Amino acid sequence: MTENAPTGPAPLLNDGSGEPVTFTKYDRRSLSYASTFDHPVKSGIISAIELFTGKLKVLRLIRQFEKQGAPTGQGFWRAALDTMGIDLTTPQEQLDRIPKTGPVVVVANHPHGMVDGMIFADLIGRVRPDYWILTRSLLTSIDEVAGSYMIPVPFPHDPDAQRKGVEMRAKAMAHLKDGGVVALFPSGVVAASDTMFGPAIEAEWNVFTAKMIRRSGAQVVPMRFPGQNSRAYQIANKISPILRQGLLLHEIVHACDKPQGPIVGAPLSPEQMAAHADDPRGFMAWLRAHTLALKD
């Protein structure tokens, strides 16, 4: 449910549903986006913003999560979302549009942040256990088994971002060649408004996704996440990237106790894939528009 790693192993029990549970104590010190910046002043500012916005609420959720115990692996995501009060309303018939076998790339817009990755994991895991999600590295260090479904994506300000990005792409391609599922947010950033009081806009989609699709021969399934982050986040985004980063824990709290109903589209047809075969950038622009236009 959060980006903090367990402090050590805990006994496994059974919650009555057949799902093993573990009563793990999480390290509160790692509950921060401040560690994504090396500069001590920037890190300090982010830590202070987090403390006065969403961190205390998230800490209370963690304590609740620890007391009730959590399933390990795939079941971790549903238990975490339940603790956060996030009910997923996507119907099973939409999830069944995800092919049961063969390489698949699932693409989605990115309106919220970490919560999008958690929802991705819960929904896709109901259909395909062989999925990997490309997500910011903070989300990969939670439950050890749940984190194994993630490929870390470095933040742009990471001094080693280029090397880590190359490794990430190689892992994703290898998984697709093995017939697995790779899910990602092609924009690479959370949607934000162009003005302080305008609507959040999904950023352009990276052409790397098109190259990955072409080289792997994977089927493509679009998914649209409704909603956007709070107005405070949109304003912060226009003021400073540090202020924006400091509000990411606040956005986790903002997402709590609200249902989410991502819309899963049908796999792209061969005709749709062929229409932009020689234009990766044009293909991604079309795929972005196609995904954002999905309706129930």
Predicted regions and their residues:
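Membrane-anchoring hydrophobic helices of lipid-metabolizing enzymes
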Residues: T2-V107, G117-I119, R126-D130
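Catalytic core of membrane glycerolipid acyltransferases/transacylases, capturing the structured
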Residues: S47, L56-R60, V105-A161
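Residue-level detector of flexible, active-site-proximal loop/helix-junction positions
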Residues: L95, L138-T140, H157, G227, ...
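Short, conserved catalytic or adaptor-binding loops enriched in Gly and charged residues
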Residues: R78-D82, I142, I252-A255
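Short, charged beta->alpha transition segments
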Residues: D87-D96, T135-L139, R169-A172
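Hydrophobic beta-strand scaffold residues
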Residues: L88, Y131-I133, V182, V220
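Short, flexible loop segments at the rims of nucleotide/cofactor-binding pockets, characterized by
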Residues: L81-I86, H110, D158-R163, G198-P199
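Non-catalytic C-terminal accessory region of glycerolipid acyltransferases
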Residues: T2, P9-L12, R29, G165-D296
